[in-house]
Amino acid sequence: MAVARLAAVAAWVPCRSWGCAAVPFGPHRGLSALLARIPQRAPRWLPACRQKTSLSFLNRPDLPNLAYKKLKGKSPGIIFIPGYLSYMNGTKALAIEEFCKSLGHACIRFDYSGVGSSDGNSEESTLGKWRKDVLSIIDDLADGPQILVGSSLGGWLMLHAAIARPEKVVALLGVATAADTLVTKFNQLPVELKKEVEMKGVWSMPSKYSEEGVYNIQYSFIKEAEHHCLLHSPIPVNCPIRLLHGMKDDIVPWHTSMQVADRVLSTDVDVILRKHSDHRMKEKADIQLLVYTIDDLIDKLSTIVN
């Protein structure tokens, strides 16, 4: 059994308030009603104030310790699963935590092994290892039912987590869900380039989101990821699923979310496309839609329970 230990780390972060965090949508609130009630303006940010946060570590025998931050609260809890080499302090993760705080719900955000504050070597990372990281967070830190929010590659992993822990994962929210995308993009390369990557052991994938202009992805990561592809067959996930995707996404085509929606067994699936949003979905309107979709899922699950 993994053990969580707390490292008191003083940090000053801005306190935020969502202008419409507690809007009541009524007992029969659906997605169309939710979108209709989203205000046209962005959330109103209040002046920064001091707030002490704490960084914790999940100790795992024979596995790297995972850095995480956990907000205690009521169920269902929210777990944010980041994208490739992304940290737990990203825009979406922080916005979700603040939104959960305003509603009194539990929230967990974490760094994969080899990433951010977690132990491990990023060059030794694999999708399978990160899958184990997600399951460790669910098994050892999360209390009760959970809504998983997966960003990009995190959306791929949230599907795997839902398959492995159906009794605990009660809803999914994917943002630019990158199911199978890394493998698909690599397989689309010219044969000569694929051979070159195999010889070098690294694929320098161009990306405007990297400071270096490329993501240096280990060839071993790509080959191992082939064992975790999902879109070739029905995906045994039956919980409510919401998939958000920007139509200007030049990293993960928005059609990927459509494929996921088609492959999952769940009949409660909504795909929401934003015409002018890119891969990161970090604009204020994107974040607003994200947190309101979480709120809608919480309301839906509460209605089912009651």
From Swiss-Prot:
Inhibited by palmostatin-B. It catalyses: S-hexadecanoyl-L-cysteinyl-[protein] + H2O = L-cysteinyl-[protein] + hexadecanoate + H(+); mycophenolic acid O-acyl-beta-D-glucuronide + H2O = mycophenolate + D-glucuronate + H(+). SUPFAM superfamilies: alpha/beta-Hydrolases. Its EC number is 3.1.2.22, 3.1.1.93. InterPro entries: AB_hydrolase_1, AB_hydrolase_fold, ABHD10_acyl-thioesterase. GO terms for cellular component: mitochondrion. The active site is at S152 (charge relay system), D249 (charge relay system), H279 (charge relay system). PANTHER family: MYCOPHENOLIC ACID ACYL-GLUCURONIDE ESTERASE, MITOCHONDRIAL, PALMITOYL-PROTEIN THIOESTERASE ABHD10, MITOCHONDRIAL. Belongs to the AB hydrolase superfamily. This is Palmitoyl-protein thioesterase ABHD10, mitochondrial. It comes from Pongo abelii (Sumatran orangutan).
